[in-house]
């Protein structure tokens, strides 16, 4: 079997409760939602997938990948195996040294999920008042990527 892309949830929890997400519903994730995949288990899964033609790993699922404080280490594992590391995130934690570590680890694609075009619509959809912070994080990350050549 040929598997060129894998979506691997390294973190089950989320720091948002977006209107459109099943995780935000009562009982949406149950008790296991706080679990994180260990680095060892992740590397074992990647080792197995590489032999099937793996080219891209999406480090997300229903959980928020940036809640995993070792996200940069997961990216490094993907890169060591010759694949690309993609992520979708609400962007709330992508700032400062954490953001730089994730970028410098070799992230190939990082999408900020911003539902709403101003603080009011963002709040209505994402149940968060962090619109300005997330926009600032996005702009800072863009500058860092451009300035560092990452």
Which role does the model predict for each range below?
Residues 116:
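The feature captures the short pre-catalytic strand/loop hairpin that immediately precedes
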Residues 1-109, 120, 124-125, 129-132, ...:
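Conserved alpha-helical substructure of the radical SAM core
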Residues 144-150:
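Short, intrinsically disordered, charge-balanced linker/junction segments flanking boundaries
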């Amino acid at each position: 079997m040929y598997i060129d892309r894998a979506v691997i949830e390294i973190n089950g929890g989320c720091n948002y409760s977006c209107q459109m997400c099943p995780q935000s519903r009562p009982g949406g994730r149950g008790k296991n939602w706080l679990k994180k995949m260990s680095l060892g288990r992740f590397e074992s899964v990647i080792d197995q997938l590489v032999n099937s033609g793996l080219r891209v790993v999406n480090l997300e699922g229903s959980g928020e990948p940036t809640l995993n404080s070792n996200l940069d280490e997961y990216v490094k594992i993907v890169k060591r195996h010759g694949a690309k590391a993609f992520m979708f995130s609400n962007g709330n934690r992508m700032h400062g040294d954490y953001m730089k570590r994730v970028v410098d680890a070799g992230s190939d694609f990082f999408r900020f999920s911003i539902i709403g075009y101003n603080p009011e619509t963002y709040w209505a959809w994402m149940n968060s008042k962090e619109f300005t912070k997330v926009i600032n994080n996005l702009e800072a990350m863009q500058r860092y990527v451009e300035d560092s050549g990452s």
